[in-house]
Amino acid sequence: HTNDRRQRQMCIRDSLSLAQVDVDNLLSVRANFCSARVNYRRQRGGGKGQMIAKAVGLSSSTAPNVFDATAGLGGDAFVLASLGCPVTMTERVPEVHALLTDGLCLAHEWGSENDQSLVAILKRMALVGSDAAKYMQTIEDAKKPEVVYLDPMFPQRTKSARVKKEMQVFHQLIAKDSDANLLLQIALECAQKRVVVKRPRIAPYLAGLEPNYKLEGKSNRYDVYLCH
């Protein structure tokens, strides 16, 4: 169904996609864990030397369990799972939650027939619900994650063609995460070892809270808050 933001969900080639209908083009996104791009990153993406791996504390001997409170299409969770981390995910936007559920199911089906290593990765990923704040507040102390990972939506600064298509679609679907500051506070109380916040490189600190340290790339950075 098309709503006032001209968004709709539609089936394309037997997979669920979210589409933005414009006058000149059609942008669509889906959760795809079987693409050549995803496989390339699995094989040659830098392994445990990637910034996200360093940010969560992954090492040759340690693969922490991670709670991804803002899973989106599952891209970062998949990277961490491919490196050995058990990842529990939540995604609160119903349309995006549906895309992620569909993508995981299709990947399991495809992997069962074509790639058992993909199945092994997917077994380390669990989508448990939609409300991250409530979920974190109900976790028993003994089962709290070592790492909580946050990638809150941030204001779109440009409408240029360089903006990733999924961001164009998502920004039309949902507004800036107005409760991201609260989510950080809950995450700090939930995580056993650290909270990692992914941010645009030049964005202010979430909730104005300076991290213990940060890792910076060309466009993004990871703010790391250590829990004591």
Q: At which residue positions do the language-model features occur?
A:
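Single conserved hydrophobic/aromatic residue that forms the stacking wall/gate
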Residues: H1-I12
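SAM-dependent Rossmann-like transferase core, predominantly class I methyltransferases
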Residues: L27-S60
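Conserved class I S-adenosyl-L-methionine
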Residues: S61-G72
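Conserved acidic residues
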Residues: P64, E146, K193
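Conserved SAM-binding loop of SAM-dependent methyltransferases across substrates and taxa
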Residues: L73-C85
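S-adenosyl-L-methionine
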Residues: T90-V147
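Mobile active-site "lid"/loop adjacent to the S-adenosyl-L-methionine
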Residues: P152-L183
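Conserved Class I SAM-dependent methyltransferase catalytic core
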Residues: A180-L226
